[in-house]
A protein has these predicted regions:
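Acidic-enriched and Gly/Ser
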Residues: 1-120, 138-140, 149-167
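Short, conserved beta-turn/loop elements at beta-strand boundaries and strand-helix junctions
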Residues: 129-131, 141-146
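Structured alpha-helical
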Residues: 134
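Generic structural signal for buried aliphatic residues
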Residues: 122-124
Length: 167
């Protein structure tokens, strides 16, 4: 995590995340993204991408809070609202720990890749992927959808991530 970077979280309409990112990324000094995750699609039997946190856009910038607020207020699409989440009036909704977890689990393209593991004593043991060494955080696993539920406190959201068991 770069100390001169500031992280912001925007709430918007589900399915409009990419539209918001596109507008924000046209501004100098702003990097906006909507994290994606790989998951196993049962019907197509392929790994596909979907939004990790529907309705959320993350913004990383070296600009000051005042400059970023000005860009947020100029958002041109009236049919799409954006609202910056803050703990208090001037404190971003992301803690340093949340930023660390997010950057640790995602790759450079802001995608949480599929993890792979084995079942040992009725517990998932991840052998490769971003969840490596995080077995204790897995509290539930759905074999049919190949999704693990993580016990991570992050914007009051439940993390459901892709984990495929290998023989």
């Amino acid at each position: 995590m770069n100390l001169d970077e500031h992280w912001y979280v925007l709430l918007t309409i589900r399915s409009k995340e990419e539209e918001v990112c596109k507008y924000l990324n046209e501004n100098e000094g702003i990097f906006a993204f909507s994290p994606k995750m790989e998951f196993y699609h049962r019907v197509s039997k392929q790994i596909q991408l979907r939004t990790l946190f529907g309705g959320y856009v993350f913004v990383v910038s070296k600009l000051s809070q005042v400059e970023v607020d000005r860009i947020f207020r100029k958002f041109p699409l009236e049919s799409v609202f954006i609202h910056e989440l803050k703990y208090k009036e001037d404190i971003s909704a992301l803690t340093d720990e949340e930023i660390r977890i997010l950057t640790m689990l995602m790759d450079d393209k802001k995608i949480l890749r599929m993890s792979y593991g084995v079942l040992l004593n009725n517990k998932i043991h991840v052998t490769r992927g971003p969840l490596l060494n995080m077995d204790d955080y897995i509290i539930k696993y759905g074999k049919h959808n190949r999704l693990a539920t993580l016990n991570l406190n992050f914007l009051n959201q439940i993390w459901k991530v892709g984990v495929t068991l290998v023989e």
